[in-house]
Amino acid sequence: MGKIIFHGHSFTELHLKGSKILIDPFISGNPLCDISLDNTNCDYIILTHGHGDHFGDTIDIAKKNDATVIATAELAYYLHGKGITAHDMNLGGSHGFPFGRVKLTLAHHSSSLPDGTYAGEPAGVLIESDGKLIYHAGDTALFYDMKLIGEMHRINYALLPIGDNYTMGIDDAVKAAEFLNAETIIPIHYNTFEVIRADVDEFRRKIESIGKKCIALLPGNSIEI
């Protein structure tokens, strides 16, 4: 049995087949994060893009744990230059890892590293493990190809940004949930800062009105999958 743990903003931890995977590990500077760098351990890190609130503490965590980072080619090459083990991928590609299969999808956003380095295209990520499929959308606008993602993949859990301003807001995220046809929706990327404040109860009501389940996890909370 696997687990999804939410650590605030878009930072998500997965336990799959004995591996710990961190997605977008934003700890330092994240007022919602429930853990510190000192008690962070993992086997893999998945990055959706290079912005500081997603790239976060990747370098320190990867070095401390000798973890492999899974990312788009430009991000992976940048990390290679920092002495980090990284597996480079690109949009539409998939690859098998000990914990399951990872596929990168489109995301409509932008991507650069905190030092201004171009970081390639932003991505969403599909992770299949033990018959369960998780979709972490990263930072993205609503786009019609989400419907295609939903048609091609039976998604059990979709983690969708709802904070508006930089990403989808509530209404667009509800439409994304319709397109994806996921069983359970988990909101991310909201209430970290004032500019992305969102009413998660409103989001829950609107998701339930389209016949989907919504689980809004507080930082540190988890669900078994």
Regions found by a protein language model. Name each.
Residues 68, 80-93, 174, 178-225:
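Binuclear metal-ion centers of metallo-dependent hydrolases, dominated by the metallo-beta-lactamase
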